[in-house]
């Protein structure tokens, strides 16, 4: 695959004895699409779409090598020969497009999923991360030898199935091999613990087992943390030494990640954080080895990947979320059509659900499993009116037009985006503007007629769009209780973020959900230096959890950043009374009053605006109501709703 736009990224590279057509590799991303460890048609379709889209090499999600412990209920396994036929089908589907494929071999150790009947967890030592469900039992030396053989057995099965190699997961203080390598969890005093050489012994024995049994033409890749970024964890100097030992042991490629699972956001970076977050580590490790080095970590644009390779930070770029968000990422980038790539915003929705056993999903791509293979041409072309150019409305309009319908999109605002324009204002949310531009750009390509600056009434629709299928996607309105309107300066978070209102210096935000916390983050000073010029921001939340609907790394980064700026937080506190000059709240059975605030910001959620739908229903006009106009949710819900309804028109 050649590209004048990104010549380095789309040049071939040799990994071991195998030539890969380009340097965009897809790293392991759990999908939960397997069935009791077996490859499913959904899994085959998922990876086939990425192979067809131009990826050079795919590393699948973790594949467990023994039957007792499961990482996630929808992950794959290879602990006996019954799994081989499914892998044969998967490998053949990927190879059809000149793409290589490797499973990531893994034992979950203290990370095992809590499935009833699972015995006590095993680990390098009796310690595990704070979220482990119990104190693990140290694995015995005999069990280490048995597990080493099981890694080899799994690799042999994969070789029989026709895959091109395996990745061994030893990163993030994660799973058995990552746990043995890190001093955070390896407290052993036998030959497998203590010094760095002893802690990597198990990993080296696994590599030797696989190489001996699978031969020199079978790729062995090891995923490591170039630095665990954690007190008491592995350092970059440690990992330079480990990398040199891995090369000497016969490893063909080193996949340099970073961080740990216990330091949220360090391994898999959240939205708004540094792109190519582990490139500094891969750059340094690359200086000390003579085998290909891959880097990873929110590399979601082709130009970033091109610069990383050209600048010597890595030989290969692992681009997971980018390829999830748009399976055609590589083909579009190679052709110089980067503007047509569905933009990954780094929000980690793809990760948050799978950790609880849910199937993979994506905020921006509603058909992430197959990538737009789910809709078919309409049996009959219809005239379709979509009211509202937010994420739900634009998705519905595009898919309906692609299916063959004649679509008109009308919005009362002067530009597209709806609530997403406001959502893009706080820190770390700016990439939502790329989604707006992408969705809007597609409308012209699909032939959608867009009318802005026009608010339609039920009478307008009956008169001007008689006979049209009517899709209502005009969003929701902020909740603003009447008793809170008496304060001297009241505004909703939407009005503040949308530039319709300007706050004072001492601000109280009612509501500590995502919007409330992001608004506080937006208002607070960048540096908490106690300057008299700084705003003083307090968030009042009636539950015990801030930003409860955010997950994992994204929530951790948001809350940590907000608190570091000096935002005051009152959880399990309920506003009870508001006068012109005071805000009273109850906490722990006592009533407190804030008497010196000058601004009250309401971030208490949203409710669907049903007036237009009600008026049309009263007039006997059938409608499809979607997005926040139907049920308030997040951007993923809105886009998914638009996709689903449009597929049914």
Task: Show where each model-derived region lies.
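Short, structured coil segments at secondary-structure junctions
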Residues: 289, 312-313, 446, 486, ...
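Rossmann-like dinucleotide/flavin-binding elements
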Residues: 381-410, 451-463, 473-489, 493-550, ...
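Conserved acidic residues
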Residues: 56, 164, 252, 315, ...
């Amino acid at each position: 695959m050649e590209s004048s736009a990104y010549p380095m990224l789309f040049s071939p590279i040799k990994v071991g004895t195998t030539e890969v057509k380009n340097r965009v590799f897809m790293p392991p991303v759990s999908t939960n699409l397997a069935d009791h460890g077996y490859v499913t048609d959904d899994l085959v379709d998922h990876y086939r779409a990425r192979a067809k889209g131009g990826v050079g090499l795919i590393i699948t999600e973790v594949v467990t090598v023994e039957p007792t412990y499961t990482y996630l209920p929808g992950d794959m396994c290879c602990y006996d020969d019954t799994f081989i036929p499914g892998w044969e089908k998967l490998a053949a589907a990927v190879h059809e497009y000149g793409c290589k494929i490797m499973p990531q071999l893994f034992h979950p150790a203290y990370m095992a999923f809590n499935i009833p009947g699972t015995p006590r967890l095993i680990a390098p030592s009796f310690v595990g991360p704070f979220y482990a469900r119990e104190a693990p039992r140290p694995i015995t030396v005999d069990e280490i030898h048995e597990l080493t053989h099981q890694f080899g057995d799994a690799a042999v099965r994969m070789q029989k199935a026709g895959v091109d190699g395996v990745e061994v997961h030893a990163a993030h203080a994660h799973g058995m091999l990552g746990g043995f390598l890190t001093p955070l969890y390896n407290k052993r005093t036998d030959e497998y613990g203590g010094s760095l050489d002893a802690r990597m012994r198990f990993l080296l024995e696994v590599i030797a087992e696989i190489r001996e049994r699978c031969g020199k033409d079978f790729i062995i890749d090891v995923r490591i943390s170039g630095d665990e970024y954690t007190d008491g964890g592995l350092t970059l100097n440690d990992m330079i030494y480990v990398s040199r030992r891995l090369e000497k042991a016969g490893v063909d490629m080193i996949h340099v990640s970073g961080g740990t699972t216990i330091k949220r956001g360090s391994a898999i970076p959240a939205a708004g954080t540094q792109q190519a977050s582990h490139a500094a580590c891969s750059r340094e490790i690359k200086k000390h080895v003579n085998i290909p080095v891959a880097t990873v970590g929110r590399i979601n644009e082709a130009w970033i990947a091109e610069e990383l390779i050209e600048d010597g930070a890595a030989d290969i770029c692992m681009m997971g979320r980018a390829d999830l968000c748009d399976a055609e990422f590589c083909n579009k980038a190679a052709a110089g059509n980067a503007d047509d790539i569905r933009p990954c915003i780094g929000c980690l929705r793809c990760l948050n659900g799978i950790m609880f056993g849910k199937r993979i999903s994506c905020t921006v791509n509603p058909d992430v499993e197959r990538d737009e293979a789910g809709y078919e041409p309409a049996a009959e072309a219809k005239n379709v009116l979509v009211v509202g150019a937010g994420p739900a409305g634009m998705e519905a309009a595009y898919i309906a037009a692609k299916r063959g319908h004649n679509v008109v999109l009308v919005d009362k605002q002067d530009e597209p985006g709806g609530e997403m324009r406001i959502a893009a204002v706080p820190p770390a949310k700016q990439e939502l503007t790329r989604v707006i531009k992408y969705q809007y750009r597609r409308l012209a390509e699909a032939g959608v007629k867009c009318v802005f600056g026009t608010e339609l009434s039920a009478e307008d629709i009956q008169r001007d769009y008689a006979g049209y299928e009517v899709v209502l996607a005009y969003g929701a309105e902020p909740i603003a209780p009447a008793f809170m309107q008496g304060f001297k300066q009241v505004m909703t978070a939407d009005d503040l973020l949308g530039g319709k209102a300007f706050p004072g210096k001492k601000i109280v935000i009612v509501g500590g959900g995502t919007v409330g916390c992001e608004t506080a983050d937006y208002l607070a000073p960048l540096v908490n230096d106690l300057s008299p010029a700084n705003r003083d921001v307090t968030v009042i939340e009636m539950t015990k959890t801030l930003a409860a609907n955010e997950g994992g790394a994204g929530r951790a980064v948001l809350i940590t950043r907000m608190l570091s700026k000096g935002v005051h937080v009152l959880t399990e506190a309920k506003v009870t009374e508001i006068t012109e000059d005071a805000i009273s709240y109850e906490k722990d059975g006592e009533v407190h009053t804030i008497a010196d605030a000058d601004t009250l910001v309401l971030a208490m959620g949203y409710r669907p605006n049903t007036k237009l739908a009600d008026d049309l229903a009263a007039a006997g006009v059938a409608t499809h109501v979607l997005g926040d106009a139907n049920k308030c949710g997040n951007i993923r819900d809105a886009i998914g709703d638009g996709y689903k309804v449009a597929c049914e028109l």
